[in-house]
């Protein structure tokens, strides 16, 4: 049993609704800057550490926000603390968020033991889903509530080089150990996870649980696009005849879908049904009505010349090889191929996999939003129509999310991606579709998506605009600990939200093996005695063919 007199370090002098002010005991009363508890040396009241307030009723857990010197009524210098309340210890449940019994003036302030903190995490976390250790208590493992993290959306935010890729790899590795039947889809824009690691020549995730596919191999065909997405792809809404083109497009697509699938006896087919239709026939139909004349070529119909811009836009897309995965499918060119696409996408094709890594590194930057929009929509639609969706939860990990789920960019692809992921953010948890957003520019992300996240893992961020934006997202109790954002070390994070029992600062477990995200070794490469021979001809050929 820990001696209460040994852990007492001060008393409460001021109580507000959101924070308390405490005065530390003086050196004459036994103050020491460091105290040993459970064979562990504890620094007294360092910023970001945890303390307890003791009086009759449940103990209150608080976190230190700041400390300073002041003068008491006798003119003597005293040490003061500002602490934020996090929750209460109860005999029934161990620990619960929120404070119902506020302390009175004079209540004792005590140090926390590592064993007591360990109990909080062991009761809150899920099995062996450990992701790191407390920065202030390195012996205390941090376990997450997996259902809250995966099912209620989470965000991993931090500037380049802060360790986001490490954390993603570590999280998934830990999840696969404790939850081997996971269904995780990882969008990998920089090929950091999908190929063998160039440093250890070892796959980042177990090979028997992982399927790696490129966006081109996956082949997400145009006929899966919704009617709204087809409009954004083909119609210039600022054009004079845009309304006519939109209305005519609806009728043509619906007729083509019904005619192409008549033998399948689907019954009712809508303009949004994911069934095959011929893009060539669509083009021919618009061209026919655009060129139709009357009176032996002397007169024009109401539609003559009204589809010029749509035809030009469609021809432009068809001639752009970057859109071949979408507009010129070689495998997904029949309605029944959707079954195989879905199985491959979700890791259900033989052999099955727990993680599907979609390598997006070969996808051009301006086409990326269109690709990711379809991936997000496929995941949502599958479980939306799955009557047992609660038994098949899916997680979408969106690395570099700001490049395709952007707040303000208004290209057709960005609008489509924003709409797709905002729908998941708002209603995905009802159908077992979760998001993990990973970004170095939180202020550039869709506000709707980020605000729907229930857990935030904030790594080093020095940009003042991004720091302020993060503060606007998290609860007030975490604001003090967020002051450390710019001083976090690589691989260190501040965690808040429902996946953790309280705001905390932790050191993320190093992934083993790590992703292929290490910085380029300029000094090493430039000082080599036998440098690598650059194959300029091969590189230029790849560039010209748009193949990586």
Where in the sequence are the language-model features?
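Conserved AAA+ ATPase "SRH/arginine-finger" region at the nucleotide-binding site
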Residues: 212-224, 456-465
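Conserved AAA+ ATPase small/helical "lid" subdomain
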Residues: 241-265, 483-514
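Hydrophobic residues in beta-strands of the RecA-like P-loop NTPase core, especially within AAA+ ATPase
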Residues: 187, 398, 438-439
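P-loop NTPase motor domains
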Residues: 191-195, 201, 222-420
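Conserved P-loop NTPase motor module
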Residues: 491-548
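Conserved ATP-driven motor cores of ASCE-family P-loop NTPases powering translocation/secretion/packaging/pilus
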Residues: 422-427, 431-507
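Basic- and hydrophobic-enriched, low-structure N-terminal and domain-boundary segments
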Residues: 1-157, 171, 389-392, 445
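Glycine-rich phosphate-binding loop of nucleotide-binding enzymes
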Residues: 128-216, 495, 526-527, 536-537
């Amino acid at each position: 049993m820990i001696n209460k007199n040994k852990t007492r370090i001060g008393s409460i002098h001021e109580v507000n609704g959101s924070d308390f002010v405490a005065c530390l005991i003086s050196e004459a009363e036994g103050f020491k800057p460091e105290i040993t508890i459970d064979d562990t040396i504890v620094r007294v009241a360092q910023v970001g550490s945890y303390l307890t307030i003791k009086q009759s009723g449940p103990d209150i857990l608080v976190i230190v926000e700041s400390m300073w010197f002041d003068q008491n009524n006798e003119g003597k210098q005293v040490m003061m603390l500002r602490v934020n309340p996090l929750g209460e210890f109860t005999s029934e449940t161990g620990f619960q968020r929120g404070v119902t019994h506020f302390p009175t003036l004079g209540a004792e302030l005590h140090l926390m033991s590592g064993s007591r903190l360990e109990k909080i995490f062991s009761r809150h976390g899920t099995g062996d889903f450990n992701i790191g250790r407390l920065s202030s208590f390195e012996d205390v493992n941090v376990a997450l509530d997996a259902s809250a993290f995966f099912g209620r959306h989470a965000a991993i935010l931090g500037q380049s080089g802060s360790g986001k890729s490490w954390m993603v790899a570590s999280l998934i590795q830990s999840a696969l150990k404790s939850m081997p039947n996971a269904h995780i889809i990882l969008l990998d824009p920089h090929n950091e996870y999908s190929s063998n690691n160039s440093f250890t020549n070892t796959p980042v995730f177990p090979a028997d649980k992982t399927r790696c596919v490129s966006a081109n191999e996956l082949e997400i065909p145009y006929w899966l696009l919704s009617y709204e997405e087809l409009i954004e792809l083909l119609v210039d809404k600022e054009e004079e005849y845009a309304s006519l083109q939109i209305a005519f497009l609806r009728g043509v697509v619906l007729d083509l879908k019904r005619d192409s699938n008549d033998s399948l006896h689907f019954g009712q087919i809508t303009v949004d049904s994911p069934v095959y239709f011929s893009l060539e026939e669509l083009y021919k139909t618009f061209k026919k009505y655009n060129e139709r004349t009357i009176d032996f070529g002397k007169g024009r119909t109401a539609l003559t010349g009204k589809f010029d811009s749509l035809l030009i836009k469609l021809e432009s897309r068809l001639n752009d090889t970057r859109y071949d995965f979408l507009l010129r499918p070689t495998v997904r060119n029949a309605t029944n191929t959707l079954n195989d696409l879905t199985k491959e996408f979700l890791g259900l094709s033989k052999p099955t996999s727990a993680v599907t890594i979609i390598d997006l590194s070969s996808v051009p930057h301006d086409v990326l939003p269109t690709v990711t929009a379809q991936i997000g929509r496929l995941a949502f639609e599958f479980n939306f129509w799955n009557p047992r969706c609660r038994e098949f939860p899916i997680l979408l990990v969106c690395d570099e999310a700001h490049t395709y789920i952007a707040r303000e960019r208004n290209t057709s692809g960005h609008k489509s991606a924003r709409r797709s992921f905002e729908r998941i953010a708002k209603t995905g948890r009802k159908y077992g579709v979760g998001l993990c957003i990973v970004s170095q520019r939180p202020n550039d992300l869709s506000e709707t998506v980020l605000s729907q996240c229930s857990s935030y893992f904030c790594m080093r961020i020095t940009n003042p605009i991004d720091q302020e934006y993060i503060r606007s997202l998290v609860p007030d109790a975490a604001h003090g600990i967020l002051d450390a954002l710019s001083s976090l070390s690589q691989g260190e994070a501040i965690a808040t939200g429902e996946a953790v029992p309280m705001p905390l600062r932790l050191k993320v477990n190093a992934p083993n093996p790590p992703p292929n995200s290490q910085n380029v070794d300029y000094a090493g490469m430039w000082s080599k005695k036998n440098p690598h021979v650059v194959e300029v001809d091969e590189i230029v050929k790849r560039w010209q063919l748009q193949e990586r």
